[in-house]
């Protein structure tokens, strides 16, 4: 996981952007929890635009990053090749409902509408999502609780010599175990 930091490989990444293709970026990354800086993603989007390539940015966990302004959702107005994916299931605890949304230019949304799955989100899911997004105190409270609990877990894992816990900006931790895999499989 030493090369997970895109800032160290940004130019190499940009050089590999395909012409007339698409690029998927998960920010924060899953499973590492590494948050890519907004400026770096904007450079990728701009480079992709020159190659007529669409950039999909999965921001499923971005709302669970405390005090962050690294979302590129406001860049939609500047780049017609950008599409943002968001989920309400993670940030608002609606995992059983499985609901999210996408934001992008008409040039991207139009073709996506033609190939979308034939069924829409249920009424129950729509009402639950509407209620959840209107209740901002829940998200603020959740972020504070996650930060506290994540610090507790990571500090206790760090005390053990059997685990390496990687820094994460979001609500999950990537943990490397020093225990042999055969023992873990038992």
Describe the residue ranges of each PLM region:
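Hydrophobic residues at beta-strand termini and immediately following loops
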Residues: 1-4, 85
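Active-site phosphate-binding strand-loop segment of PLP-dependent enzymes
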Residues: 4-66
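Catalytic-core regions built around general acid/base machinery
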Residues: 40-51, 71-78, 111
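PLP-dependent aminotransferase class I/II
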Residues: 81-159, 163-166
